[in-house]
C-alpha cells in the first residue's frame, strides 16, 4: 500500500483543510479510491499532523503526486 503525503502541519485543522484543498485538484474517481488520513507524529519542534491520501498502488500514488506537485510518495512502511 502506498500514500501521497501533501504536508505536515501544526494543527489537525490545517491538515484537514490541506486534504480538502488537494482533493479539489484531483479527479473525483481518484479521491473516492483513497483513504484520506491524518497521521499525528512527534518532531523536534513538537507535534505535527501529516496529511495523506492512502490506500493506493505505487503507480496511483505517483500519478497523484504528479498532479499535486508539492507532495511525496510513501510506501506503507514509512
Language-model features and meaning:
Residues 1-3:
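Short structural boundary motif marking the start of a folded domain
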Residues 6-7:
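Local beta-strand/beta-hairpin segments that build beta-sheet-rich folds
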Residues 10-78:
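Extracytoplasmic
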Amino acid at each position: 500500500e502506498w500514500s501521497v503525503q501533501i504536508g505536515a502541519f501544526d494543527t489537525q485543522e490545517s491538515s484537514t483543510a490541506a486534504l480538502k484543498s488537494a482533493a479539489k485538484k484531483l479527479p473525483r474517481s481518484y479521491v473516492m479510491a483513497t483513504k484520506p488520513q491524518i497521521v499525528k507524529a512527534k518532531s523536534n519542534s513538537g507535534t505535527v499532523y501529516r496529511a495523506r491520501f492512502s490506500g493506493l498502488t505505487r503507480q496511483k500514488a505517483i500519478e497523484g503526486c504528479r498532479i499535486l506537485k508539492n507532495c511525496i510518495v510513501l510506501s506503507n512502511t514509512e
